[in-house]
Swiss-Prot record:
Domain of life: Bacteria
Subunit structure: The glycine cleavage system is composed of four proteins: P, T, L and H.
UniProt protein name: Glycine cleavage system H protein
Cofactor: (R)-lipoate
Species of provenance: Methylobacterium sp. (strain 4-46)
Pfam families in the cross-refs: GCV_H (PF01597)
Length: 120
């Protein structure tokens, strides 16, 4: 089940661990990514705080923590090959995984239909 934020991040929950990335819309708006900076494993994130940075030839953009939690894994493959985020933003282009402080907080995020209806 995918959930989305108004800042164009997505989450996929498996148990109490969420995989986080940017949406296809965000990747298209940024253009070709040339640099990705991810949070370190063990970092505690607060909802709305800058968690990662994605940089394209057009702009650099913060990726915000969608919920409170602790980083359990960073996708080093996208650091080595940032274009993966453009090619498969909601798959192989995921950014990091985090253990949610409160998995029920996921309910506050948008489902796919609500995200699709969001003005872009």
């Amino acid at each position: 089940m995918l959930r989305f934020t108004e800042d164009h991040e997505w989450l996929r929950l498996e148990g109490d661990v969420a995989t986080v990335g940017i949406t296809r819309h965000a990747a298209e708006q940024l253009g070709d990514l040339v640099f990705v900076d991810l949070p370190k494993v063990g970092t505690t994130l607060s909802k709305g705080a800058a968690a990662a940075v994605v940089e394209s030839v057009k702009a650099a953009s913060d990726v915000y923590a969608p919920l409170d939690g602790e980083v359990t894994e960073a996708n080093d493959a996208v650091v080595a090959a940032p274009e993966t985020v453009n090619q498969d933003p909601e798959g192989a282009g995921w950014l990091y995984r985090m253990r949610l402080a409160d998995p029920s907080s996921l309910d506050a995020l948008m489902d796919e239909a609500a995200y699709a209806a969001l003005p872009k």
